[in-house]
Amino acid sequence: MNIYRYEENPLITPLDVKPIHEGFEVIGAFNGGVAEYNGEVLLLLRVAEKPVSEDPEIVLAPVYNAKNKELELQSFRLDDENYDFEDPRMIRSKAKLEGFSYLTSLSYIRIARSKDGHHFTLDEKPFLYPFNEYQTFGIEDARVTQIGDTYHVNFSAVSEFGVADALVTTKDFENLEYQGNIFAPENKDVLIFPEKINGKYYALHRPSLKSIGNLDIWIASSPDLRSFGDHRHLLGIRPGEYDSGRVGGGCVPIKTEEGWLILYHGATEENRYVMGAALLDLNDPTIVLKRTKTPILEPVADYEKNGFFGDVVFACGAIQEGDTLHMYYGVADTSMAGCDMKISEILHQLEVEAK
């Protein structure tokens, strides 16, 4: 399959983003949801800011205080035997077998705008910043689904309660209406379908399991995009394949004559992230028709292989223009990149590899 990576890649890097917090540095501008509005391409970037510690023996963790509406810093000494600091992204309590106690950065959503889809200008202020007790550790990985003239923006809400998926709606990317948490912890990678199917809304989601099971994609339906039920398993991991470790939703589902085209991320046990594709039935998206056996996009460029967390391509959105798909994706948990691919070629790969 032919893939055209933009010559301007990476399109946005941490160096392009000025931190909004004094004494912080931007360590990531990545995993942006995508929308078209008012003649522009909008990237709803996840911006990760990390507090700079003046003492090399102290690690700082930013926490949003939902009661007083202020950002606070927790301090931890590296010689504190109660905590594990091996992963630079988080602080783990040794008393907990899994998960983390704090993050070393705070993420929020900031919009980058472009007239041509290649050159972007960043808004100075956040589009979404933590505002309640379910977002005290940050807001991550937005996806945007347009239904009529309303844009539904869902995102991971991270706090001491876990990772939930929350929803806001907007018509102009200025005025927002908070719709609440639509999936309870532990859940992420939610993709809302852009239209009703047989009178129901549908969404893909990825529960994160603690005891048994795998990190697989599920599907649920809803009468109103607020209350989701009828949860069903949809796409699982595949031992020995590019998605043997985990799978999760990527871009908002794309309607084609052959079915709903799903572009999802898959990772190995070694955390090499690629993009794969699947085709769901047009009238019953709980039915998987086909699935790629090889990735449609994988980390090969230097900016995809090297960064804060290397060997990662992670798409959260795309824009369809006829048969061309303009896909924007996070690279190495650091920056944003873009590429063009043909929908017909993805469908052809699905057809060939289904045999």
UniProtKB/Swiss-Prot annotation:
Described purpose of this protein according to its UniProt entry: Catalyzes the reversible phosphorolysis of 1,2-beta-oligomannan. In phosphorolytic reactions, prefers beta-1,2-mannobiose (beta-1,2-Man2) as substrate, but can also use beta-1,2-mannotriose.
Q: From which organism does this entry originate?
A: Listeria innocua serovar 6a (strain ATCC BAA-680 / CLIP 11262)
**Which one of the record's GO molecular function terms can you name?**
glycosyltransferase activity
Q: What is its EC number?
A: 2.4.1.339
Q: What is this protein called?
A: Beta-1,2-mannobiose phosphorylase
Q: How does it assemble?
A: Homodimer.
Disulfide cross-links: none
Its lineage reads: Bacteria, Bacillati, Bacillota, Bacilli, Bacillales
Q: Which UniProt keywords apply?
A: Glycosyltransferase, Transferase
Q: Which reaction does it catalyse?
A: beta-D-mannopyranosyl-(1->2)-D-mannopyranose + phosphate = alpha-D-mannose 1-phosphate + D-mannose
List ligand-binding residues for beta-D-Manp-(1->2)-beta-D-Manp-(1->2)-D-Manp.
Answer: 31, 46, 89, 140-141, 188, 273, 333
Enzyme type, top EC level: transferase
Q: Looking at the record's lineage, which domain of life comes first?
A: Bacteria
One Pfam family per UniProt: Glyco_hydro_130
